[in-house]
Amino acid sequence: MYSTTILLVQPETSSGVYLRTRLETKGYTVVEAPDTTTAMNIVNGSEIALVVTELYLRTGKSRCLARTIGQSPALRRTKVLAYTKHGKREDRAWARRIGADGYVITRSGEDRFLEVVDDLMETPSTPRRGRSSDATTE
């Protein structure tokens, strides 16, 4: 069965509550994690289709969360969306190198965020990593 569960990784904020509400309204199940340790515990123990995270959010050994997920054989079908304030060309290149499947700059707005989430959730998951979807925006 195809999972419709999205893990939203960010500290509790009003924008996080708003994004969760918008995602749930669209029919997605949303799980939240306030930090990377909690996020990795959830991802390792649940069927998560998509992880939404800040591009440079670090895990315990100072490794990028997106890269950690992308390099795990058990999680290589889990998609990662970098939802970030960083919009430089080198940030996008970094996201592609570490295996982010999509990239949205926060100032693009929630509607664009939801479009990219829908695109990623509709695209069949493949076990390949180190790629980035065309679902990117400024």
What are these model-derived regions, one by one?
Residues 10:
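Conserved acidic carboxylate
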Residues 13-31:
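Two-component/phosphorelay signaling modules centered on CheY-like receiver
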Residues 54-69:
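Conserved phosphotransfer microenvironments
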Residues 64, 86-104, 112-115:
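Alpha4 helix (beta4-alpha4-beta5 surface) of REC/receiver domains from two-component response regulators
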Residues 124-138:
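CheY-like receiver
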